Structure formats: C-alpha cells, structure tokens
C-alpha cells in the first residue's frame, strides 16, 4: 500500500472512474487481511465489481438512504458491508467493515 492518504488508481474503458480509498477503508482492509483472508478476497472481488458496474452486480448493491448522497453499499458478509460513493469521475471507497 502507498503512504498517501488516499490511494488512487484508474481503470480503462469508456466511463473510466478513478478509485479513491479512504483511510478508514484501508484500515478495514488491513484488518481483514490479518484476521480473515477469505473476506479480504471478497473485498477485492467487490471492488472489481464496483469499478465495472457501480449500481448492479455481486453483493446486492443498494443505495443508502440515510448516509451521504450518492452512497451505496454491497454485502460483504451477513454482518459487514462495503460502502462507496459514486460520482462522474471517481468512486470513493469509504469502509468495508461493520454495517454502515
């Protein structure tokens, strides 16, 4: 992982969006790598899915009603969710642990 506060990556394609990983998200991912690698791999699957199709696909994507505007979640486990915000040019990954 990079030492930058927000690690940025780009994808290729007609609607390429930049991926921004917030510090809390990176901390959550480190937790999964240390405690449950299967869940960590699921996080990477969901990231790939979100980057391809932010509003449909695996993990039962659903818009969040009571969080910030444009926030979506996908089911990571029965208890935990991956939360992200989609804008025109980027996808911000906010957290991947706990239920919102």
Model-derived features with residue positions:
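Basic, Lys/Arg-enriched alpha-helical interface segments
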Residues: 1-79, 86-100
């Amino acid at each position: 992982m990079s030492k930058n506060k927000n690690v940025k990556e780009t994808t290729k394609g007609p609607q390429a969006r930049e991926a921004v990983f917030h510090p809390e998200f990176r901390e959550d991912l480190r937790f999964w790598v240390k405690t449950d690698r299967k869940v960590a791999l699921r996080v990477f699957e969901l990231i790939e899915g979100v980057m391809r199709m932010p509003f449909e696909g695996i993990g039962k994507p659903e818009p969040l009603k009571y969080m910030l505007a444009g926030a979506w979640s996908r089911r990571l486990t029965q208890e935990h969710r991956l939360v992200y915000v989609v804008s025109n040019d980027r996808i911000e990954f906010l957290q991947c642990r706990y239920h919102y």
